[in-house]
Every structure is written in structure tokens, then in C-alpha cells.
């Protein structure tokens, strides 16, 4: 990822509370962090997985053409009955026969269990963005919310295995701040 490709995704979140910053900037497995802080049962609830076109701001990062399909997977991470994170991942179609073929059958398993248990997987630095209604992921992230916020913080990074990448974007829902 270069600066031109990430012009509106920043290397550090600005104007954010220390509590929210702790969630956003943690480089470990978000799944494991939520599981440790969740007093209820943790679960992954898939809402979409299919070959699809990707968001405009993902094209250059993933080196995809506008008409090129990728596997798009969207899930909510729940603490009990409360969604705390909306996760969106993108894998180029051509990489589904290679390094990332195991992602097709993840179902309600966490992607983090695949990414953080393989020592060969490399991660780029996190990038951050405050999503508004103008971003396509904002409305998708808000589907499970009773009240739509004015904005939502998101982070994303590339995970690479054998030269093939998956882009993972995590959108933090307001309820994440209620976890101890």
C-alpha cells in the first residue's frame, strides 16, 4: 500500500478517546481481545460471503480492476447479543485457489483464528479512517444498530501469505466501548 492508495486512510487515528484508541491500535487478534473482555458468549455471525466487486478505495490496495471480482466476506463479531465489530474482508478471486483457499469454508469461524495462528502470515501497519454515511461500509456496518451514529471508526490492513494478500477492514461499533 502506498500513500496515494491510502490517501484517506491514516497511519494514526486523530481526535479519539484513549479507550477507543486502545481498541483501534491493538495489533493483536481483535477476536482474542474481544473474547477476553466479553463477559458473555463471543460469536461470529456471517452476513455476506460471495464473489463481488469491491469498494472503490479497495481497488488499488488489492491491485484489482473495477470489474474484477473478489471474495467478499462480511461478519459481525458479537459479545452476547450485542454486535461490537463489523468485519469486511476481501481476497482476489485468483488467490482463492492458492494461499487463501481455506477462507471459503470459514462459516461462523473467526478469520483471526486463521491469520494469527500461522507464523508465515505477515501484516502491514494498520491504517485508520472515520467512516461516514458516504462510505459504503458505513451503512452495512450499521444494519444491526438500533440507532445510527454520525460516524464509525474503522481500521484496515493487508495480511500476506506466500505473496497473496487479503484486505481486512474492521469497523468498530459504539458498543465496543462498553467492554471492560
UniProtKB/Swiss-Prot annotation:
Broad class of the protein's primary localization: cytoplasm
Homology family: Belongs to the UbiC family.
Signal peptide segment: none
A Pfam family reported for this protein in Swiss-Prot or TrEMBL: Chor_lyase
Cited InterPro entries: Chorismate--pyruvate_lyase (IPR007440), Chorismate_lyase_/UTRA_dom_sf (IPR028978)
E.C. number: 4.1.3.40
This protein's GO CC annotations: cytosol
Annotated Gene3D superfamilies: Chorismate lyase-like (3.40.1410.10)
Keyword Lyase annotated: yes
Disulfide bridge map: none
Subcellular location: Cytoplasm
Originating organism: Nitrosospira multiformis (strain ATCC 25196 / NCIMB 11849 / C 71)
Reactions listed under catalytic activity: chorismate = 4-hydroxybenzoate + pyruvate
Name used for this protein in its record: Probable chorismate pyruvate-lyase
Keywords: Cytoplasm, Lyase, Pyruvate, Ubiquinone biosynthesis
Domain of life: Bacteria
Residues binding substrate, per UniProt: 73, 111, 170
One example GO MF annotation: chorismate lyase activity
Recorded name of the encoding gene: ubiC
Entry annotated with the keyword ATP-binding: no
Any one GO biological process: ubiquinone biosynthetic process
Amino acid at each position: 500500500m502506498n500513500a496515494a492508495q491510502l490517501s484517506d486512510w491514516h497511519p494514526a487515528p486523530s481526535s479519539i478517546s484513549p479507550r477507543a484508541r486502545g481498541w483501534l491500535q491493538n495489533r493483536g487478534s481483535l477476536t482474542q481481545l474481544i473474547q477476553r473482555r466479553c463477559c458473555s458468549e463471543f460469536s461470529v455471525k456471517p452476513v455476506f460471503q460471495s464473489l463481488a466487486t469491491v469498494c472503490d478505495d479497495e481497488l488499488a490496495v488489492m491491485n484489482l480492476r473495477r470489474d474484477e471480482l473478489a471474495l467478499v466476506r462480511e461478519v459481525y463479531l458479537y459479545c452476547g447479543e450485542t454486535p461490537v465489530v463489523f468485519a469486511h474482508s476481501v481476497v482476489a478471486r485468483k488467490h482463492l485457489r492458492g494461499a487463501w483457499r481455506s477462507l471459503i469454508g470459514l462459516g461462523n469461524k473467526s478469520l483471526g483464528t486463521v491469520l494469527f495462528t500461522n507464523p508465515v502470515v505477515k501484516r502491514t501497519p494498520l491504517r485508520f479512517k472515520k467512516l461516514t454515511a458516504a462510505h459504503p461500509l458505513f451503512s452495512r456496518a450499521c444494519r444491526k444498530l438500533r440507532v445510527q451514529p454520525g460516524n464509525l471508526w474503522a481500521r484496515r490492513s493487508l495480511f500476506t501469505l506466500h505473496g497473496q494478500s487479503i484486505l481486512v477492514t474492521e469497523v468498530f461499533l459504539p458498543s465496543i466501548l462498553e467492554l471492560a
